[in-house]
Amino acid sequence: GVILDSPDMQKRVKQLDYGVGFNGYFNAGVMLINNDEWRKNNVTQESLSMINCGKIFRYADQDVLNILLNGKVKYLQRKFNNKTTLSVNFDAEAKNIDNTIIMHYVTPNKPWYKIFKARYFDRYFNESPWKNNRRFFSPSPSEIRLKAKREMSGKNYSIGLYYYFCYLISKVFRLRF
């Protein structure tokens, strides 16, 4: 089972001419896989062969899976893959979360880094068996610097200085905290 990708992505992929029907391209970040069928059709090996054939696929493994599984998938409701993004420059999570089963953070910015505000993730993380596990502060020093700039431009000087200090420490001492 897969979830159709956004209309914008359908248009972009149509131009790539992969042979995937318009409005048939799915987001491969969340898939419900029938393991017996997957093995029977040798999907892992076929995917690796395509990825290593030398052709450049715009959306990498997602394109390959769409090509290989074209016409062989069942489409599920969007609530099983509600895509959202995170950034230090704005606070955003999925707007329509009613009935959401799986929230999928689609950028490299993931909610398990403390620098990103992700109220839904935080809520469920704090109720999970992993609530006492350490969460890293940021994926990179540059994200900390962006957060510092955002806070400073919002006139939150003490918070901005705190993040800038964290940025300097992580950059100079190559620390990850």
Show the residue positions of the predicted features.
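A glycosyltransferase accessory/donor-loop signature
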Residues: 28, 35-177
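Short, P/G- and charge-enriched loop/turn segments at secondary-structure junctions
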Residues: 15-21, 89-91
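Conserved donor-nucleotide/metal-binding helix-loop-beta segment in metal-dependent transferases, i.e.
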Residues: 1-17
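A recurrent flexible, glycine/aromatic-enriched loop bordering the glycosyltransferase active site
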Residues: 19-30, 57
